[in-house]
């Protein structure tokens, strides 16, 4: 049976957990269904972090992997921005925002470390 190399990455596991937490948070939002597109975007952007890490790991070169890690980081920042907007609209609590931001900071640091370690091997 084939093993997927991205499953060996701790950052991928953290990103999957981050997406699960963000999606769980979005399921409890009370937006009167007026802003469904924003809620959907939060779910999509949060899932995109782990998806881009996995896709990049499956690419042919280290440079391509780095590019996908940058895309993953962009999706992470997008998710945090949406969470800040949701907090301003009082759709999520300060505590929920802080939890997401704390997870995002850890993941961003891990992505940066992975990028730097790959650069050293080029």
Give each language-model segment a name.
Residues 1-122:
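Amphipathic alpha-helical assembly/interaction segments
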């Amino acid at each position: 049976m084939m093993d997927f190399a991205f499953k060996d990455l701790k950052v991928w596991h953290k990103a999957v957990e981050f997406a699960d937490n963000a999606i769980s948070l979005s399921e409890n939002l009370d937006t009167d269904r007026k802003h469904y597109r924003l809620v959907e975007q939060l779910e999509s952007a949060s899932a995109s972090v782990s998806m881009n890490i996995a896709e990049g790991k499956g690419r042919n070169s280290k440079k391509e992997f780095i590019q996908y890690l940058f895309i993953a980081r962009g999706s992470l920042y997008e998710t945090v921005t949406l969470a800040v907007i949701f907090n301003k609209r009082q759709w999520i609590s300060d505590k929920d925002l802080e939890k997401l931001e704390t997870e995002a900071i850890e993941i961003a640091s891990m992505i940066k470390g992975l990028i730097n370690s790959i650069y050293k091997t080029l």
